[in-house]
Amino acid sequence: MPPSMIRVLYATDGCAITYSLMLLTGQEPSGAVYVVSYAWDGAGLDEAFSLPGERAEAELLARRPGVTFCLTGHVASVRVRPVFVAAATPAVVRALCRGEPLAARDVLEAMDEAATFALHDGLIAALTMVLEQVRPRTGNAEYAPERPLRSIAVGRRGLTSLFVHHETQTLAAFRRLYGNHNTPFWYVARFGPEEKTLVLATRLHLFHPRPAYDLRALKDLLLTYNPRVDPNPSGLDPAGLLSFAALSRFCCLSGYARGPAAAHAARYVDERVRADRAEMGVLRDYISHDRGSLKLPDREFVTYVYLAHFESFNRARLREHLDAVNVTDPAAPVGRSPLGERAAAAFFRHVRAQLNIRDYVAQNVTPSVARLAPAMGAGYVEDRTYAALAADAPRGLCDAAAGLARRVTAVEERLAPHGWVRAPDEEQQQPGADGAVLRRLLELAAAPGGGRARTALGALLGLPDACPPAPVYRVELAHRRQAFAVLAGDAWGRATARRDAAPEMAAHEPAAQMYVSRHEVFNARLAVTNIVLDVDFRLARPVPAGTLEAAMRGFRRAVLDALALLFPEADGDWAAHPCYVYKSACPPGGALAAAAGSASAASSDDGLEEAPWDDDAALADFGAAPGDEDWADWDAGVPAEVYTCDDDEVGVGIGGAGGDPGASALVRAPVPADERPPCGCRAKMGFRVCTPVPSPYAVAGADTVRGLARVLQQAVLLERDFIEPMGPYLQDFTFVDTGVYAHGRSLRLPFFAKVDGGGCHGRLLPFGDAPPGFDDPRNFHFHARPAHAVTRVLHSLGGEYESFFERKAARNREAFFARRTPLADMLRGLAVDAEDRRALEAFVADVAMAPVLRHLDAHFNGRAHEYAGATAQRVVAKPDWVLFQLCGSARFSCLRARHARSPPARTFVALSVDAHDRLCISLSQQCFATKCGSNATRTIFTAEVGQSCSSAGARCTSSSSG
């Protein structure tokens, strides 16, 4: 076989298999052979096919290469299969270069019989043995089995014999090897519709297959291969190629069939694929690097991955990449694409800033600080921090909500003539209004004295000398009840002395229970002088004691490093700055079980004891929007039976791990090898981390404190001395609850326990060797009066610290996709004022709930009646989303699962505008059962509110029962 070979894809007007068999058996069928496409192997042929017209024909006749005629394969793995081999005769060359039909006589004259039947002899022998049942003899007459095989006729004579005697079976065998369903339209539709892809994609896909990409990808790659070629001299158009004669002439005369455009096409495709993979590799490398170093919550990391791809491969970036790899000179190499570099500059450089706390704060956080004169600062501290916390005996009151409501109402009536604004009567009379007492208590406790002898606080407590402001506490009672307390001072030694008390049953008496379980209520009207972090670690496995101690030292270091950046004018030595760490006591028997290596006790079916309501963290997923700090009336209005601990959900018991969180906090130390067993916390571990705001600063506003907590969590995630020892033990990296920093939310204080059906347990105790002052209430209350003078007030923490990825994604949606109608405008078109709280609540209860009720009736049998007559109370309002809690005459049962003891589920609805610019209402629930995620918010379904806003005009569009 000649070293230079041309492979030809041919077609016939009739059945190509029958036509080919007739040629192979020496017959001369009617009709002609048409060259559809061809490719060559051998460097010498590149020169021949680069010559124009007649010179190319002369060069091919001089070189006399072999020509293999092929048909398409019947299976995808074999795209073309050879049928016969011929010499490059003048007729064959004209068929290649001009697209002229090749007569059967010309094919027979050019056919190389030996080379041709070398392709088919194996098939001919196999067919002969099967069809004529040739078998070697056995037994006494046995002889060499290869002898009858030698006697089988092969070549043209053998094929002719088979074709004559077994025509049907022979045709069937060849049709299993070769495809025979191709028409001119099939080629144009599959490889066209334009000339370049019809010629080049056919050649490259069939003769130069690549397993890495398919035909669609090949055609896309050729879109940027644009060599200059002359117009097709055939004068034909791809849409008019209705016969193989026209198709052959069009393809063989095309400028893409010969010359530099054809010679360099395969090389260009390979280089283009390498260029694309190189740019994709840059993206993969960045993501792989960040996967190990960028500690993000799972949901946020998924957002990051999608966002990285969008930033790298959005329309603008892809257009730049395609312009860079586009070529007009076939011999030119593929250009260098800026895709990876632009992605690094536009996106990943900002991500890298998330990996260094100094860069993170510098690029993403913009603090706003007000400077006060010393006298003004002293007045600010006097009006905005607790006047007193310590006293020889408790000075104040503690009672259930109903009793306090009557007392507050009486006090407001006494103060009304002096300008006090009373709560509206209808607010006090609506269902669940007893909870509004908390908001009213916060107002009375924070009302400044203004130099008057009688104050609102004094009137409330019956203590004329009581100086405001005063702390407000929530007290957990037995059987999921609660009480509230307002104290102008307390004997804190009584509380801290109980640190070693054994677990006990919860009491019903508020005054006694106040020293067992107490939660400080956040008052957004007061200044924050202690940063108190509610830290909950969800564990993949128990943490060894030494590892935990080392990790918490890293935690403290990260917090102080970040605060040093956020408060650059702070006085004092950061290495000596106090940072108090308190840990929730382990479950009873947990430490023994851990030491013995036994598994923790199995939970109940629904986990009601394991996962009680965590009301102070229940809406952490929702956050709080500016201007919505006044929804404490809703928070406290929920019956106390749904209240329990606010922070960690750790379990029951006493005890804690040792450590030294205060020693050498800012000096890196190696993680000590520790053989001590882990503590008894096996699934969750709760901490309270408290550090005073440094002199001369104070912090104002719930949003500011919430922002500080987010920045501090990011700082902890970037601290190697925390993440390296602790990372393998954590299920996720969201452990600082920022939802507690909202007006009316409460957080359990150190030295106090949580309460549920199992009694009082999980007391927050000092972790390790606590620094001096760990038992001083001025060091773990949000609004305690500082010992230093205040001349700087941090009142805003702007920037992108909240969520770099979410904000970036929001900008991309605004830049690349259609803008949605603002929710306020959508509601305004329905004659509803989004700023009018009562009108909005009435709209939800009377109109928007209609599709929700119909969907409940259709898909949740027996549940719709629970929602009949339900009212809606606004919880959170954001520009594009408003959340309401539903309040019904009865409890709402869980819609996600059936529970043995029918636990109540907190139910919400949210108004928003979807991607199709439709007003939608979504129903979601929080169920405290373990199988439902232990208070995790789950959307049950979403329905569209019809534009007519009538109960008949609203229709449900989608649902998911989870």
Curated annotation (Swiss-Prot):
It comes from the Viruses. Associates with the helicase and the primase-associated factor to form the helicase-primase factor. A zinc finger (CHC2-type) spans 894-932. Belongs to the herpesviridae DNA primase family. It comes from Suid herpesvirus 1 (strain Kaplan) (SuHV-1). GO terms for molecular function: DNA-directed RNA polymerase activity; zinc ion binding. HAMAP family: HSV_PRIM (MF_04011). This is DNA primase.
